[in-house]
Amino acid sequence: MLQQNNLQNNKGLSQATYSLENIASIVDGELIGDPNQLVSSLGSLQKASKDCISFVSSKKFESFISDCSAGAIIVKKDFKPADNKNYILVKDPYFAFAILSEMFDPIEDMFEGIDLSNNINPKAEVAESSKIYQGAVIADTAKIHQNVLIGPNVFVGPDCIVGEGTVIHANSTLMRSVTLGKNCIVQNNCILGSDGFGFAPSEDGYKKIHQLGRLIIGDDVEFGAGCTIDRGALEDTVIGNGVKLDNQVHIAHNVILGDNSAIAAKCAIAGSTRIGKNLQMGGLSGIIGHLEICDNVFIGAHTLITKSISKPGNYVGIMPAQEHTDWARSSVAIRKLSKK
């Protein structure tokens, strides 16, 4: 059983609600639809509910609009609505989304309520059989299950859950909204659930997109030292059961990594890529964003995957270093040879 302690002076998570009239004014947009419709969160086109607001920043995503259940959709000014949904027309939907992400970010002060004499927020749920070592900080709304070991100077942030039998070594961080399964091992200096790399460009620079999703990690997962795994922007980042990561692996926001995958040191997977089971990646290899990778793919060391993979197999793309012009010619020649 989890031990529930009392909490003092906790504000909790904000649950702000706005009318579409408010939203349109905030993002300097034109509202088409019901000005009194209320929304309380952001959501993707595929998963948004009636109390969510979503956005479309590219024509390639407009095909999702017809099935979208969002309370309103932010679109470009030249968009021509063909139904009775609520729309907000703006110059730049992505930048408008960035503005709203800050409004709907629920975390005000993740360190509030922590007593510096023991570093555990009095509302945190900590099982009696777990061990928490000196300097570790446990935020409010965090839950630590049975037989967990949390090393020195670990931070477990708001809405984080640590499963039974999991070990988190010194100086690691579960930033926020991280669910860590049973019997996991987190080696030193890992950062789980950090902000993804999301910024909306404008003429004046970049506007930060607040990351509102979670990081969901399965059972029997091991993270080598110095791994960095971002939580989702709107939807969740998901790491499957039995995954093993070597040192200094980076996985970006919204990635889905299938069960029993193994990734060697200093690999990186860019945002919103979906990967099946049993992936193996050799050291210093990478996968760019928004791809689909099937089950049972092996990627050789130093290989960069730039297209989706639908056929299981061993994929290698290593070339000796050359001057750029020579490299470009060699690449074209190799592609022609492989098609013969």
List the predicted regions and their residue ranges.
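Structural signal for interior beta-strand "rungs" in well-ordered beta-sheet cores
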Residues: 55, 114-323
